[in-house]
Amino acid sequence: MPGTIILAIETSCDETGVGITRLEADGTLTLLADEVASSVDEHVRFGGVVPEIASRAHLEALGPAMRRALTTAGIVRPDVVATTIGPGLAGALLVGVAAAKAYAAAWGVPFYAVNHLGGHLAADVYEHGPLPECVALLVSGGHTHLLHVRSLGEPMVELGATVDDAAGEAYDKVARLLGLGYPGGKVLDDLARSGDPDAIVFPRGMTGPSDDPCAFSFSGLKTAVACYVEAHPDFRPADVAAGFQEAVADVLTRKAVRAATGLGVSTLLIAGGVAANSRLRELATQRCSEAGLTLRIPRPRLCTDNGAMIAAFAAHLVAAKAAPSPLDVPSDPGLPVVKGQVG
């Protein structure tokens, strides 16, 4: 099989991912396998991810996911092994990092330690090809960042981030307020489709003239939803969901488009789990069109955590002839977003 075969493992939170991609001689990527096993059902009754349960689930799921991926890709061993090194849950990361190092050593192939958040940005390469200079809006359960990305191989510049709750975290908290359970992203998105986004106008945090134009705040929005629900016992859940979702999408897209136009950058990339949200995608498409920006968003399957995105970032490192990471590099639960490769 021509090209360089890269196998990557993702275990930063509650999804066990194994992705296998082929880096072609011309730099293009061919995704050969994308296996994901989620432990979300085991966390539902706790209303959020329990780190110990997530770690044990990774231990149980990784071996079978690896075998399925190798079979699907039709290979016996890859040319390169990569893994998420951080950020994420400490125990969950250790499972994937230890496994990836063991596989790399046993197969005698190079090992690359990859930033989970950089992987989210790289996932779009499967959809739209090499990433040009862009402003990236990275939105997930634990992170909300605006980044200036010149290329995947250069250090990213953080333009702003949330000062409190991440966007995905706000979704989960509002879903609990409405009695919708965990996780909240998809269920709120689905419910909002039958609601009126103009029926309840919730506040847009950090949008005043004196506020940081690239910073975000969703704690006040969450509190506003809680106060509304308490004051209106007969509230219509679909309208609350629609109003909340409209506020989130409005702030995210408004600030991202403004950042791109302000920097004179012609491309906006939206990545991370929240990028799968239908209203965010719709409003971003509209506002980028109005601003003359090219919008890049991966398909929803590639927005959530997976091994394919880690393989994509590792492929960029291999193509750039970056030195492999040492096998003694430790996992880093608090790894900053601006650092793509570790070691």
UniProtKB/Swiss-Prot annotation:
Domain of life: Bacteria
Catalytic activity: L-threonylcarbamoyladenylate + adenosine(37) in tRNA = N(6)-L-threonylcarbamoyladenosine(37) in tRNA + AMP + H(+)
PROSITE patterns (alphabetical): GLYCOPROTEASE
MF GO annotations: iron ion binding; N(6)-L-threonylcarbamoyladenine synthase activity
Cofactor binding description: Binds 1 Fe(2+) ion per subunit.
GO cellular component, one term: cytoplasm
Binding of substrate, residues: L138, V139, S140, G141, G142, D172, G185, D189, N277
Residues bound to Fe cation: H116, H120, D305
Major location category of this protein: cytoplasm
Swiss-Prot/TrEMBL keywords: Acyltransferase, Cytoplasm, Iron, Metal-binding, Transferase, tRNA processing
Places the protein is found: Cytoplasm
Cited SUPFAM superfamilies: Actin-like ATPase domain
Top EC class, one word: transferase
GO biological process, one term: tRNA threonylcarbamoyladenosine modification
Enzyme Commission number(s) of this protein: 2.3.1.234
Cofactor(s) for this UniProt protein: Fe(2+)
Protein's job: Required for the formation of a threonylcarbamoyl group on adenosine at position 37 (t(6)A37) in tRNAs that read codons beginning with adenine. Is involved in the transfer of the threonylcarbamoyl moiety of threonylcarbamoyl-AMP (TC-AMP) to the N6 group of A37, together with TsaE and TsaB. TsaD likely plays a direct catalytic role in this reaction.
Family label: Belongs to the KAE1 / TsaD family.
Name under which the protein is recorded: tRNA N6-adenosine threonylcarbamoyltransferase
Species this protein is from: Mycobacterium ulcerans (strain Agy99)
Taxonomic path: Bacteria, Bacillati, Actinomycetota, Actinomycetes, Mycobacteriales
